[in-house]
């Protein structure tokens, strides 16, 4: 996955991923055309927590779940459960979004 081939949701007057032009060579675009409409699942993971079933059952409304990340630390962005990028949480018009700050290359998943 080349960094210049990725498009992402951008906010504040910029294009959304669905509106962004696809910048691929003619041969590459023709080769990939059959998969352009295949849906993918994108997840932005704020952090993770481990606990026992007993601790889980004690959680209720108002409980605080402490995550393994610090405030301001990059979050992981997954496409179909595969880590592809890291980013920062942003707020735009009362909605959450993610600004991608790092593209993860194959084999650099650490």
From Swiss-Prot:
The keyword Transcription regulation does not apply. The lineage of its organism: Bacteria, Pseudomonadati, Pseudomonadota, Alphaproteobacteria, Caulobacterales. The keyword Cell membrane applies. Keywords: Bacterial flagellum, Cell inner membrane, Cell membrane, Chemotaxis, Flagellar rotation, Membrane. GO terms for molecular function: cytoskeletal motor activity. PANTHER family: FLAGELLAR MOTOR SWITCH PROTEIN FLIN, PTHR43484. GO terms for biological process: bacterial-type flagellum-dependent cell motility; chemotaxis. NCBIfam families: fliN (TIGR02480). It comes from Caulobacter vibrioides (strain ATCC 19089 / CIP 103742 / CB 15). This is Flagellar motor switch protein FliN. Belongs to the FliN/MopA/SpaO family. It is found in: Cell inner membrane; Bacterial flagellum basal body. Signal peptide: none annotated. FliN is one of three proteins (FliG, FliN, FliM) that form the rotor-mounted switch complex (C ring), located at the base of the basal body. This complex interacts with the CheY and CheZ chemotaxis proteins, in addition to contacting components of the motor that determine the direction of flagellar rotation. GO terms for cellular component: bacterial-type flagellum basal body; plasma membrane. InterPro entries: FliN, FliN-like_C, FliN/MopA/SpaO, FliN_T3SS_HrcQb, SpoA-like_sf. It comes from the Bacteria.
